[in-house]
């Protein structure tokens, strides 16, 4: 059903925490992050569009909740060490709140469904954007789309599943007007 207030088929409640800017405003300014910063309204729009595309893989719910935390290499390294036993920074982490085959009872279907949290390192995203020769905002969209797919049960334990996931990320970015070249 199309929501009159937003014009979207799928409703999403997004909590964006820009810890990178809040913790390091001078570094954010010096690094050019401020010029590439994605507004909360833009993130909200992107997630709406992405979830509409991925609607067939969503459990039924009146709306979906997602947390997005933008941080630095130091914090993401600590999180990576704590939860994945990898004591090094990474680009994106996703913490799914649901098991993929979780049975849904009627009470669960009536409430907003919390999908999980995505954590992105701005430092790593900046490096990767430079290596890929595209903007920081493009890299942030790419990494966040990757995290969203993980929240929905996608994984890439082998080359074939990685290629399928990367192809889906390309589709998601095209939906928000970002064209990206990926070498599979």
Swiss-Prot record:
The keyword Protein biosynthesis does not apply. Its cofactor is Zn(2+). Zn(2+) binds at residues 146, 150, 156. It is an enzyme of class 3 (hydrolase). SUPFAM superfamilies: Metalloproteases ('zincins'), catalytic domain. PROSITE patterns: UPF0054. It is found in: Cytoplasm. Belongs to the endoribonuclease YbeY family. PANTHER family: ENDORIBONUCLEASE YBEY, CHLOROPLASTIC (PTHR46986:SF1). Single strand-specific metallo-endoribonuclease involved in late-stage 70S ribosome quality control and in maturation of the 3' terminus of the 16S rRNA. This is Endoribonuclease YbeY. It comes from Nostoc sp. (strain PCC 7120 / SAG 25.82 / UTEX 2576).
């Amino acid at each position: 059903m199309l929501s009159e207030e937003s014009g979207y088929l799928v409703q999403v409640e997004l909590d964006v925490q820009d810890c990178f800017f809040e913790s390091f405003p001078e570094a954010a300014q010096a690094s050019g992050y401020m010029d590439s910063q994605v507004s909360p309204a833009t993130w909200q729009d992107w997630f709406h569009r992405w979830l509409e595309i991925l609607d067939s893989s969503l459990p039924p719910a009146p709306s979906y909740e997602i947390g997005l935390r933008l941080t630095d290499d130091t914090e993401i390294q600590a999180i990576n060490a704590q939860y994945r036993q990898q004591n090094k920074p990474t680009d994106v982490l996703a913490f799914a709140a649901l098991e993929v085959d979780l049975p849904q009872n009627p009470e669960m279907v009536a409430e907003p469904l919390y999908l999980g949290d995505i954590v992105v390192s701005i430092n790593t995203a900046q490096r990767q954007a430079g290596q890929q020769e595209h903007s920081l905002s493009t890299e942030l969209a790419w990494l966040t789309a990757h995290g969203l797919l993980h929240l929905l049960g996608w994984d890439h334990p082998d080359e074939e599943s990685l290629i399928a996931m990367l192809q889906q990320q390309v589709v998601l970015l095209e939906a928000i007007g970002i064209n990206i070249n990926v070498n599979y």
